[in-house]
């Protein structure tokens, strides 16, 4: 990922059990999310839209990308705790994104330099 980001002068984000974001110079590791999120169609598409919005207004585009991935993962974790399956997860994920407080974000989003 780092070599691709450097060579093409882009930000690369790879999601999985631990998510990684890099511009080739700075790399972040983000913990969060839940396996059930992979069962809901369009969660990745929605995340991409949120990343686009964040980098449009954020000065530090790599950190903005990592932050949104962390927030989205946290919303997914919270949603999975109360969801019965993928259908209710979709609804609860959106509700958690809408209702999440800045205190919840600051206390629970796990972003580290990798």
PLM feature spans:
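Short glycine/threonine-rich catalytic loop with a Thr-x-Gly-x-Asp
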Residues: 34-51, 61, 86
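Charged C-terminal helix
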Residues: 74-114
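Short coil/turn connectors at secondary-structure junctions
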Residues: 7-9, 25, 43-46, 59-61
